[in-house]
Amino acid sequence: MDDAFTVDDLIACYARGVFPMADAREDESLFLIDPERRGVLPLGTFHIPKRLARTVRNGPYEVRVDTAFDTVIENCAASRPGRLDTWINHPIQRLYGQLYARGLAHSVETWLGDELVGGLYGVSLGGAFFGESMFSTARDASKVALVHLVARLIAGGYELLDTQFLTEHLAQFGVMEISRADYRRRLSKALATPGDFYGLAAGATGIDCLQAISQAS
């Protein structure tokens, strides 16, 4: 894929069910992925382990939205023990920054005091949210962000949370695999549904998020 790939091309890719990746951080090229089996997280059956629910309910974290998007994606791209490289290269980082500027990409951030210790980012189109990546430097920090994301999507009337792939880490929350054809059907319905990423009340607490998720089950 050449340098002519624009943010509008990226939006069109998501709308037809494909997404970009790179082979390595320093590789400037992109390629498109269209998995035969797609990971999705049904919002109505999201599972929260008991210990995580206690952390969400009692702290010590504060969760913010869209206050440090660039820092979140930078952390997601950083090398970590057991993962020396990343699929998030500089063109991807630039394109998602442009999506964020258009209000189509968002970050959910977990803070411990003034320190960003976890978070995730993704793309929002209609009633579909495409989770891209997450990071954590403190216990359960990215998981707390995921709980807040799910509550936000439920409150905003979203139909689809696309996780791209099913991993052992995501399976504990109820992520499942569906066929490409089933995914396309769900995506088409979700894109036709208006989703409000800011539908969750400002200042919603962890308890508020747990209640929203429980009511949707």
From Swiss-Prot:
Top EC class per UniProt? transferase
Which subcellular locations apply to this protein?
Cytoplasm
Q: What is this protein called?
A: Leucyl/phenylalanyl-tRNA--protein transferase
Sum up the protein's function in the record's words: Functions in the N-end rule pathway of protein degradation where it conjugates Leu, Phe and, less efficiently, Met from aminoacyl-tRNAs to the N-termini of proteins containing an N-terminal arginine or lysine.
Would you identify the family this protein belongs to, as annotated?
Answer: Belongs to the L/F-transferase family.
Please state the gene responsible for encoding this protein. Answer: aat
Mitochondrion among keywords = no
Name the InterPro entries for this protein.
Answer: Acyl_CoA_acyltransferase, Leu/Phe-tRNA_Trfase, Leu/Phe-tRNA_Trfase_C
Q: Where does it primarily localize?
A: cytoplasm
Where does the source fall among the domains of life? Bacteria
Tell me one GO molecular function of this protein. leucyl-tRNA--protein transferase activity
Which HAMAP family does the UniProt record give? Leu_Phe_trans
Q: Which UniProt keywords apply?
A: Acyltransferase, Cytoplasm, Transferase
* Biological process terms in GO annotation: protein catabolic process
Sorted alphabetically, the Gene Ontology cellular component annotations on this record are: cytoplasm
Catalytic reaction equation(s): N-terminal L-lysyl-[protein] + L-leucyl-tRNA(Leu) = N-terminal L-leucyl-L-lysyl-[protein] + tRNA(Leu) + H(+); N-terminal L-arginyl-[protein] + L-leucyl-tRNA(Leu) = N-terminal L-leucyl-L-arginyl-[protein] + tRNA(Leu) + H(+); L-phenylalanyl-tRNA(Phe) + an N-terminal L-alpha-aminoacyl-[protein] = an N-terminal L-phenylalanyl-L-alpha-aminoacyl-[protein] + tRNA(Phe)
Tell me yes or no: is Acyltransferase among this UniProt entry's keywords.
yes
Q: What is its EC number?
A: 2.3.2.6
